[in-house]
Amino acid sequence: MADRHTLEELNNCSRDELITIVLMMQGQLDTLNENIERLIEQVRIANSYRFGKHTETLDSIDGQLSFFDEAENCCNLSVPEPAAEEVLPSRRNHKKKGQRETDLKDFPEEILPPYQVSTEELDTFYGAGNWRRMKDETYKRLRHEPESWTVEIHTVEVYVGTGGDHQDEFLRGKRPKDLLRGSIVTPSLLASILNVKYVNSSALHRVEQEFQRNGVNISRQTMSNWIIRCAEKYFAPFVDRMKQELLSLPVTQSDETPTQVIGDSDRPNSKCYMWVHCSGEFYKERPVVIYEYQKGRDHEKPLEFYRNYKGVLVTDSLEQYHLLDKKLPGVTNANCWAHARRAFADAVKAADKKNPLSVKTSVAYQALQKIAEFYRIDTELKELPATDRLTQRQTRIKPLVEDFFAWAKQQAAECTVPPKSRTGQGLNFVIHQENYLKVFLTDGDIPIDNSASERAIRTFCIGKKNWMFHNTAKGAGASALVYSISETAKLNNLRPYYYFRYILTELPKYCDEKGNIDPEKLDQLMPWAEELPEECRKPRRS
């Protein structure tokens, strides 16, 4: 708080003292104005996230700016008048004939009784005998029947010896192994529960209510117990085998999101984390997603996961990942350009839209334009082989990246924007992350951003909005295992319900007397295995 001077004190001040007071007040006023601008920016950004579109694309931002001066922004006298052919609507493209037949060909068909016209009605309408039958008209409709329930009654033949060496000894028919001993759960029932909760992001209490509406009384506690027991017994070794596949790849990606676990928190509302690790975006042969629940967010968690890994890890700017780069000789950390541009996008969203010209000449907007050019070129290269993509990146993108960092350093050195503003924070971020942001230029298999892992974790983020929290660490760990399988199945074009049903049917057969599973036998059950039945695979539209 500045000292307040009375009129009498100011009248008694010398010229030099008055100059000192004025300069001091100007400095304080500049600081206040800077703080006010920063607070206004924060409010606008918060409102944008709350009420605006959650997009950072430059096209969307341009559209928002041009809304206020559409005529001036759209005016271009050099554009020629359009021809009549360009103005008049073209003939509508009709739907491909036979597509409905193709879509319905794999479903069972039921021929219904024909809709007949009686002879009496025909004679009345046409006159007696003045008619003949034509070819029948047929059409198809798709019928859906709600889920059905069947109680399976298994019969095991039992014999007893009445003489000889095995007198009074019992012999029973060989029965299949139960999924869970003594439980009524079957692979199809548990697969249905897993599909609703983890694939369709519904809470177990809603599953319980739907079951009750169908006359089936299975509590959510029972369903939760089934999930945890099967996860520990079957899914844990299954996901371990998937993890081996992931860590054999040269490029992986990682991200994390907070979650609440009631029974594993030190204090109310404390955050635990669900980490996701996935194969690189350009690896299409055997894509893998691994979820991992951890109580904290320190670097020890990813350090343990990637301890024996040798390759490139694409992440956001979290310092924990940078420590992996320093502590693990085999790991190279690459940063995400989508995160690098976020602060600039926020700054443009928070700018005064009533003055589009000043926005488009701002440092933040220029930064977005430069980064958008990287993306535009890299998008053109997505379908190329890795070697060709690398060559094109070195030739076309690398000079632009070098120019961007030189420009960013110049803007920071000239203090063209307040350091604490979103633009200033963005400049500081990219300058300090320069080495990590350039890694994608060294290998054609490294993606420009970490969007693949963010897509992989999206299903979990949608789900936690519905079920809010986990009760125990065991439940969170079981969820991580199930999400790993379901998300990997989707990436491999499988139908999660049928895939869960199949592996839950097969996995009990792989258990020895102690309940252990040989990892090598799991290869034929992996989401990319050729041995999977056709019903597990997602049908392709021709």
Indicate where each model-derived feature is located.
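Short, flexible loop/hinge motifs at secondary-structure junctions
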Residues: M1-R181, S224, Q253-S254, R393-R396, ...
